[in-house]
Amino acid sequence: MYGYRERIGMILPSTNTVAEQEFFRMAPSGVSTHVTRVKLTATNPEGLKAMADNARRATDEMMSCLADVILYGCTSGSFLQGIEWEEKFRKELSAQAQRPVLTTANNCHQALQALGKRKISIATPYIDALNQAAYRYYTDLGYDIVCMKGLGIETATNIGKNPPHVIYNLGKSAVTKETQVLFLSCTGIRSIEILQQLQDDLGIPAFSSNVANLWACLRTHGINEKLNGLGALMQLP
């Protein structure tokens, strides 16, 4: 049976072509990933808010495959409306599903806490409005964002078209002498091929939204397996 250790149910933006593939490549033996999608019409605040309105329907679909944990796999879609909204959204969906429902924004917060770092650089594919929302969300959580760099991509399907070396260079450009950890934000960017090399070259921890999501899903279900080649986070309990 696939998923005899854990079944992860992932709710993705309809435009995302990366997260599913990265989970398939990263997940340890016995962990399966099952995906449903919510319509994203535009990569802007209005489009992301409309997408979140369909989360209940998608959660129902994930429950029908007996997922052990359900992941709302959109970073900007879960930080956009702030800390209180994210917490309420997560708790309401968890109550509906009668099992843990996680959000990417909070998983990345938990990853930063586990790494024990407060001075962060964030690299994103986002437009300015979403970068500003990310800045507010993580600053409100108590982090010192020393640098933020975005690609300014307006068309969601173009996010996943960036080859890994583009994300490598974007990540490097966001790091300053003050940076203690690099966060590659967005489940739609392809980064697992370069993440370990980027961390090694920078000499500081680096993680992506997708790595934080897998780490959180595994730990929620008591799977503490360390996965090599995916940065410092996947070496933590």
Spans of model-derived segments:
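N-terminal glycine-rich anion-binding loop in soluble enzyme alpha/beta folds
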Residues: 1-57, 123, 128-163
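Short, well-structured alpha-helical segments in soluble
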Residues: 52-65, 167-179
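Hydrophobic alpha-helical segments within soluble ligand-binding/sensing domains
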Residues: 56-59, 101-116, 212-223
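Glycine/small-residue-rich loop that forms an oxyanion/phosphate-binding "nest" at active or ligand-binding sites
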Residues: 59-106
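Periplasmic-binding protein-like
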Residues: 68-73, 121-122, 179-186
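Conserved beta-alpha
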Residues: 89-154, 231-235
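Short, flexible loop segments at boundaries between secondary-structure elements
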Residues: 153-158, 204-226
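Hydrophobic alpha-helical
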Residues: 168-201, 214
